[in-house]
Amino acid sequence: NDVKEFAPTYHKIDYQKIDKGQLLEINIFDLHFGKLCWGLETGDNYDTKIARKRFLNAISAIISRAKGYDIKRVLFPIGNDFFNSDDLNNQTTAGTPQDEDVRWQKTFRAGRQLLIDGIDMLSQIAPVDVVVVQGNHDWERSFYVGDVLDCWYNKNENVNVNNNPTPRKHYKFGNCLISYTHGNNEKVSD
């Protein structure tokens, strides 16, 4: 917890007072940040630059569509295979080899910055609740980046990060309960 005291200072945003506003949920799942694809082999090129552009374009497009709505809060679940691999050998959590764009350290740092950029964009609309949902490709890295975000936004009253180490996360808004899990370990009987 001592790292939190070094968190950057964000100024509190005075949002418009909304009594019965709506929740804006932005769920960009399976980004597989760090994945490398060659278009002639896979049908489409993909790398960290393309992933970053798609991620930020998706957030911008959803923000644009949400104009005119009274947004009370933003719910931003992250993880869900945000990263393509989980270890220094470029493997998933289960050990499946992956084609990676760059070194794992560079991927982690670039992914961390991408999430910060996205959260900062969203926090201009309304307070943001970040929920970390670990995936089958990036179980550990999702937790690590969630911990970094929790520390980073510690002094930011506009952002809350839920990085509890449970595979299922729950979020209540008004009379609605929204639940998340990556789904790779769920069974119909669950």
Task: Identify what each model region corresponds to.
Residues 1-190:
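Extended recognition/assembly regions associated with phosphoester-bond processing machinery
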